[in-house]
Amino acid sequence: MQPLLLTTSEGEAIVNRPERELRILCDHDWLHVTWTRHAEGQRGAEPHIHLHHVDGFFVLAGRMALRVGPELEPVGVTAGTLVLVPPGVVHGFDNDGPGELRFLNFHAPGCGFVQYLRKEGEFDQQPPPADGGRLAADVIVTLPGGGERFQREDRAVTILGGLPDISVLLLEVEPEWTGIPPHDHDDQVDAFFVLEGEVGFIAGDAVAHGAPGSFYAATPGARHGIENPGGRISLLNIHGPDAGFADWVRSQ
């Protein structure tokens, strides 16, 4: 079993028009990941809830007009911000501008999201309930520079947000960082998205080059790791489910 490595443009295209684009990056049952681009003025999702999974967003560029909670409180989500919406919280979003919006969307567990996009099945999504659902305060919103930051000798690890079904971390490394030795997991999907720098992703006995915008996912049992060619690197690291990973980082 090999990890998956692709660029956003290589993801399975559900929509690809000048004004909007959506591509599937990962469709494992434990973690669905998509990449989306919306031109200014494009509508995103009407207010809704999920009963059984977390809906997460990481904004790569632009500004997302997010609305959450019983009162649909507005939250301006700028580039570098993570949002994790737990089950039972009403949420919706649009791109009110200025400019283009690009973001990653996480569903953990998947609960049929990519099958819904492919028009192959039902999805864990409901209209807002009569009681308004859970409070907006239950949503995790981590702005750029926020989160739990742990400074190591050759890197900084920041827990941007974590729930039992998903944790999202930011890994920022110095040129002397040697990487992550090959390993595997049996209880989670371990995924990375390159924000800055050049990365060597281990796939079996080979090392594949990953530039900014590359996505790398190791499903359970897949041997994976990272090599640093010698530069500064910034990576998102997504674990679905968390499976104790955030607490392990805190304990180091």
Stretches found by the model and what they are:
Residues G92-I140, G225, P229-Q252:
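Double-stranded beta-helix
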Residues A45-P47, L66-R67, V75, V85, ...:
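Short beta-strand His + acidic residue motifs that chelate non-heme Fe in jelly-roll/DSBH
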Residues D29-W30, H52, E71, P98-G99, ...:
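Short strand-connecting beta-turns/loops that link adjacent beta-strands
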Residues D29-L31, A39-R43, R63-M64, G110, ...:
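Short, charged/polar surface micro-motifs in flexible loops or helix N-caps
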Residues E71-P87, D205-P220:
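Short acidic-glycine-tyrosine-enriched beta hairpin
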Residues D29, R67-E71, E153, P164, ...:
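Short strand-coil-strand connectors
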Residues R37-A39, I49-L66, F106, E172-E174, ...:
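Short, conserved beta-strand element in jelly-roll/cupin
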Residues M1-T34, E40, E46, R118-S167, ...:
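A short, N-terminal "cap"/entry segment at the start of jelly-roll beta-barrel domains
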